[in-house]
Amino acid sequence: MGSKIPLPQYETKGSAGLDLRACLDSNLSLQAGTSQLIPIGFAMYLEDPGLAAMVIPRSGLGSKHGIVLGNLVGLIDSDYQGELMVPAWNRSDTDFEINPGDRIAQMIIVPVIQADFEIVDEFNETQRGEKGFGSSGIN
């Protein structure tokens, strides 16, 4: 792993996401309406339970070509130690070609807070209360 395709990197100084590249031996045609696991050529282990990695779509592939992740967002826990794969989903009506080395997703490293829960009889009152979807308005 990691010898054919460069390791993930930030494309610009302001990039939040590391680009993940398709580690393929040849071009792959992702048929319209289908998904396929794409190897990205490396394994990782974060180790620190205060961190996790999230794999998310690249905005241009999603908005211009309909290529997103089959699981929408991938969460990589700090104790995972295996090879990473990207579940690419072609939600368009046109086949899409993925070439070896193409940037197909991005990964961000995020802090994690593991919450402790407790049972309570009632909550402190707030202005919003139980008002749900759309209750805070749009303007």
UniProtKB/Swiss-Prot annotation:
<dbReference type="GO" id="GO:0006226">
    <property type="term" value="P:dUMP biosynthetic process"/>
</dbReference>
<dbReference type="InterPro" id="IPR033704">
    <property type="entry name" value="dUTPase_trimeric"/>
</dbReference>
<comment type="function">
    <text>This enzyme is involved in nucleotide metabolism: it produces dUMP, the immediate precursor of thymidine nucleotides and it decreases the intracellular concentration of dUTP so that uracil cannot be incorporated into DNA.</text>
</comment>
<feature type="binding site">
    <location>
        <begin position="58"/>
        <end position="60"/>
    </location>
    <ligand>
        <name>substrate</name>
    </ligand>
</feature>
<keyword id="KW-0378">Hydrolase</keyword>
<keyword id="KW-0546">Nucleotide metabolism</keyword>
<keyword id="KW-0460">Magnesium</keyword>
<feature type="binding site">
    <location>
        <begin position="75"/>
        <end position="77"/>
    </location>
    <ligand>
        <name>substrate</name>
    </ligand>
</feature>
<dbReference type="GO" id="GO:0004170">
    <property type="term" value="F:dUTP diphosphatase activity"/>
</dbReference>
<comment type="similarity">
    <text>Belongs to the dUTPase family.</text>
</comment>
<dbReference type="GO" id="GO:0000287">
    <property type="term" value="F:magnesium ion binding"/>
</dbReference>
<dbReference type="GO" id="GO:0046081">
    <property type="term" value="P:dUTP catabolic process"/>
</dbReference>
<feature type="binding site">
    <location>
        <position position="85"/>
    </location>
    <ligand>
        <name>substrate</name>
    </ligand>
</feature>
<protein>
    <recommendedName>
        <fullName>Deoxyuridine 5'-triphosphate nucleotidohydrolase</fullName>
        <ecNumber>3.6.1.23</ecNumber>
    </recommendedName>
</protein>
<feature type="binding site">
    <location>
        <position position="71"/>
    </location>
    <ligand>
        <name>substrate</name>
    </ligand>
</feature>
<dbReference type="InterPro" id="IPR008181">
    <property type="entry name" value="dUTPase"/>
</dbReference>
<comment type="pathway">
    <text>Pyrimidine metabolism; dUMP biosynthesis; dUMP from dCTP (dUTP route): step 2/2.</text>
</comment>
<dbReference type="InterPro" id="IPR036157">
    <property type="entry name" value="dUTPase-like_sf"/>
</dbReference>
<dbReference type="InterPro" id="IPR029054">
    <property type="entry name" value="dUTPase-like"/>
</dbReference>
<dbReference type="Pfam" id="PF00692">
    <property type="entry name" value="dUTPase"/>
</dbReference>
<keyword id="KW-0479">Metal-binding</keyword>
